[in-house]
Amino acid sequence: VGIETEIFHIGTEAIRGCMGCGMCRKNKLGRCIFGEDAVNVVIKKMEECDGLIVGSPVHYAGASGGITSFLDRMFYSTGGFAYKPGAAIVSCRRAGSTAALEQLNKYFMMNNMPLVPSAYWNMVHGNTPEEVEQDLEGLMVMRTLGRNMAWMLKSIDAGKAHGI
């Protein structure tokens, strides 16, 4: 109760990789110089939200190139996500999911964001939405992750209300 969510899909968008130009840090705007693409839109949304869950398919035992380009630019251009809880989820056909989870979780850990756990690895198995719907254990893990994220957000709010 009291937790709002928004889903933002980037899978069909062309996401440019970070060039390492450093202009986002030099201009002190907390935005990438590539303009109002999905990265800058989400950065703006992240300023207003309290937590983040990132999902990716697994490609060659790693997160997709699109999501890593997205996260590279998002996290490099702003340091304003500290203490906002984060979680990663991955979807794969067979193997490589734990390596992809570790890759995504590093974005949170390197930016002082508490990791939100579940009852098991935050992954589902299947190539299609229909196959994923048959992964009952994976779906249970996702529900637990959602409850844990809500608990973490409420705990942080309670702490703030008491001066912590």
Task: Cite the ranges covered by each PLM segment.
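Glycine-rich phosphate/pyrophosphate-binding loop and the adjoining helix
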Residues: 35, 41, 114-164
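Positions that flank functional sites
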Residues: 12-13, 61, 123
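Residue-level recognition of specific faces of alpha-helices
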Residues: 17-20, 45, 73, 141
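Conserved beta-strand scaffold positions in the cores of enzyme catalytic domains, especially
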Residues: 5-7, 115
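Helix-loop-strand module that forms the ligand-binding subsite of alpha/beta enzymes
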Residues: 29, 33-120
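N-terminal beta1-alpha1 ligand-phosphate binding loop
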Residues: 1-3
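N-terminal beta-loop-helix "entrance" segment that forms/cooperates
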Residues: 7-31, 128-132
